[in-house]
Every structure is written in structure tokens, then in C-alpha cells.
């Protein structure tokens, strides 16, 4: 009775099966959510390359330019296309980074506003309770200092985006 070849792995090392499983689950999730995993320009390029009749070109030898590569007329045109794509990607990256920073600043502002609002509500409730307990109906001069509650002094200089 033979056991077959044994495979040993270091602790924490992923096997090929785990990687294939995670890749398969990622592909399934992408298909389920109907996400596009390729840039439109890449899809255009593949369509451009696949639209050429490679078999017909091989069957009938036409004088093809000496620099024709992968659907481009020359290496220079391929490099120019690549440069344009990289510039577009850079511009998109800058746009997304700016949008992310604006969202982060807005989120931070909303959090500070919420904390200020909650603190003000806490002070108002506690002050009302103290007025009802004392029965005088007059607001207290130092609001609830003996309970450890003070008004918050929130200034924009105390908070940063980092």
C-alpha cells in the first residue's frame, strides 16, 4: 500500500491549490457582480489585434513593414500608444486621489460636527436635569463643572487630515 508522493510546506506558506481556489472565487465574484477587470483601452487593443486576419496574412505573404508588431504599424506607434495610456492613467490617478482627499476631509468634518452636536445635547440634557432638581429655574453659571462636564472648544486648528 503506497501513499504516493508527499508534499511538505513551511508553516503559513500557501499551496498552489489555495491560490487557485482564491483566484477561482475571485473570478466567480467578479462575474457575479458583473465587474469589468480590464481597462477599456486594453479591451480595444485586444479587439484590434484579434480583428486582424492573422491566418490570412500568413497564407498570403504581403510586404509587411519591417517594424510591424502586435497590431501596430511600428514599434514607435506601439510606444506612442503606451505613452498615451500611461498619461491617461496618471490623470485618472490624480483625479481619484483628489476625490479621495475631498471625501476624507468631508468625513472628518462630519465626524467633528456630530461629536459637537452630541456633546451639546449632553450638556443641554444635564443642565435641564440640574434646573429641574434645584427647582429655581435659573441656569447654572458654571455649567456642570462639578460633574466634570465642560463646553467643548473645538477649533479647526486642532484637527488635521493626516
From Swiss-Prot:
This is Protein FAM167B. It comes from the Eukaryota. InterPro entries: FAM167, FAM167_domain. The lineage of its organism: Eukaryota, Metazoa, Chordata, Craniata, Vertebrata. It comes from Mus musculus (Mouse). The gene is Fam167b. Belongs to the FAM167 (SEC) family.
Amino acid at each position: 500500500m503506497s501513499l504516493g508522493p508527499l508534499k511538505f510546506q513551511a508553516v503559513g506558506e500557501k499551496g498552489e491549490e489555495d491560490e487557485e481556489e482564491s483566484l477561482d472565487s475571485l473570478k466567480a465574484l467578479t462575474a457575479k457582480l458583473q465587474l469589468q477587470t480590464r481597462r477599456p483601452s486594453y479591451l480595444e487593443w485586444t479587439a484590434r489585434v484579434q480583428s486582424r486576419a492573422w491566418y490570412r496574412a500568413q497564407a498570403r505573404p504581403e510586404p509587411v513593414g519591417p517594424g510591424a508588431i502586435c497590431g501596430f504599424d511600428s514599434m514607435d506607434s506601439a510606444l506612442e500608444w503606451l505613452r498615451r495610456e500611461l498619461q491617461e492613467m496618471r490623470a485618472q490617478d490624480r483625479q481619484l486621489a483628489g476625490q479621495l482627499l475631498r471625501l476624507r476631509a468631508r468625513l472628518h468634518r462630519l465626524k467633528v460636527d456630530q461629536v459637537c452636536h452630541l456633546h451639546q445635547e449632553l450638556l443641554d440634557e444635564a443642565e435641564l436635569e440640574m434646573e429641574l432638581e434645584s427647582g429655581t429655574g435659573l441656569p447654572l453659571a458654571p455649567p456642570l463643572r462639578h460633574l466634570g462636564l465642560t463646553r467643548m472648544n473645538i477649533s479647526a486648528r486642532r484637527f488635521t487630515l493626516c
